[in-house]
Amino acid sequence: MKNEMLALILAGGQGTRLGKLTQSIAKPAVQFGGRYRIIDFALSNCANSGIHNVGVVTQYQPLALNNHIGNGSSWGLDGINSGVSILQPYSASEGNRWFEGTSHAIYQNIDYIDSVNPEYVLILSGDHIYKMDYDDMLQSHKDNNASLTVAVLDVPLKEASRFGIMNTDANNRIVEFEEKPAQPKSTKASMGIYIFDWQRLRNMLVAAEKSKVGMSDFGKNVIPNYLESGESVYAYEFSGYWKDVGTIESLWEANMEYISPENALDSRNRQWKIYSRNLISPPNFLGANAHVEDSLVVDGCFVDGTVKHSILSTGAQVREGAEILDSVIMSGAIIGQGAKIKRAIIGEGAIISDGVEIDGTDEVQVVGYNEVVGVATDED
């Protein structure tokens, strides 16, 4: 049976700029907003867009990500005619090969894609925070009779050199692509979201592999090749909230923006929910000394200190006299008595001992997963 569109989420990146937060897990598995992991946004967008077949391409430290996704039931992707498949590097007749880039990861999974038999493939990054209707992008792709459609976002000119930049004509047909140009001619930045006609992309990847032509990356190789070959390549303009959380600072900023009830992500929109795999936790407990304001406190938290403009993830503890300001406390982390945390991200299961002070006024501070800062007590 022919399926109209298959989504492939690229989730194998190490995310080295997130430092301690990605030493033991892949970047898409990093927690966000108290209740979610970063990949939840791409998966939820697929579910809300009516895409029922999703492949998640993993490579670096995939265990936590695999456990989180499971069979896809949290996103309604476990039906008879739908499903989530975890796609990891495997041994083939030519030997073991790690994914060498974004498009090479797709080539290595040609057999899986052929088994789904899609007309179109949607390529997504698993490490961005945003909401997007992919069905609307697909309709634009069809209306333009495009071979490739690239989602673009208008960025400030001073930031444009960080992105792949698209130069378009009056009809939004892409006439030139520059990968991170020093002197950008446009402010239309690639979001790393692509819709391809599958057979055309397949033919190109197979031919490139046979001829040993380097075609491992969409931005560096595939898009320029399409343009040089005269294929119809169009830009799809996106104007909603989108955040690349590839650095500590940007991850912290996105979490702080998310706290607001009227945040740009529109997180309380019941028509476009963000789904996640949520474990059942007991209710929150606020002790006699608890003072919480302008914060998100998720299920299972224990609070007996002061929390201001911060996020407490599932099962976090803030003990008596502790003060939390402008910070993200991930699941199971313990903030000891009298500790003071300001502008920091505290990783899952971390322990901040009694009286410890962490001040990120000049630079956001990070404590890694299960890391102990100070001298832990028997109670911890």
Curated annotation (Swiss-Prot):
PROSITE patterns named among the record's database cross-references: ADP_GLC_PYROPHOSPH_1, ADP_GLC_PYROPHOSPH_2, ADP_GLC_PYROPHOSPH_3
Organismal lineage: Bacteria, Bacillati, Bacillota, Bacilli, Lactobacillales
Matches recorded under CDD domains: ADP_Glucose_PP (cd02508), LbH_G1P_AT_C (cd04651)
Protein name in the entry: Glucose-1-phosphate adenylyltransferase
Amino acids binding alpha-D-glucose 1-phosphate: G164, E179, K180, S190
InterPro entries: ADP-Glc_PPase, ADP_Glu_pyroP_CS, GlgC_bac, GlmU/GlgC-like_hexapep, NTP_transferase_dom, Nucleotide-diphossugar_trans, Trimer_LpxA-like_sf
Pathways per UniProt: Glycan biosynthesis; glycogen biosynthesis
Residues of the signal peptide: none
Species, as recorded: Streptococcus pneumoniae (strain 70585)
Keywords: ATP-binding, Carbohydrate metabolism, Glycogen biosynthesis, Glycogen metabolism, Nucleotide-binding, Nucleotidyltransferase, Transferase
Subunit and partners: Homotetramer.
Function: Involved in the biosynthesis of ADP-glucose, a building block required for the elongation reactions to produce glycogen. Catalyzes the reaction between ATP and alpha-D-glucose 1-phosphate (G1P) to produce pyrophosphate and ADP-Glc.
Keyword Transferase listed: yes
Keyword Nucleotidyltransferase recorded: yes
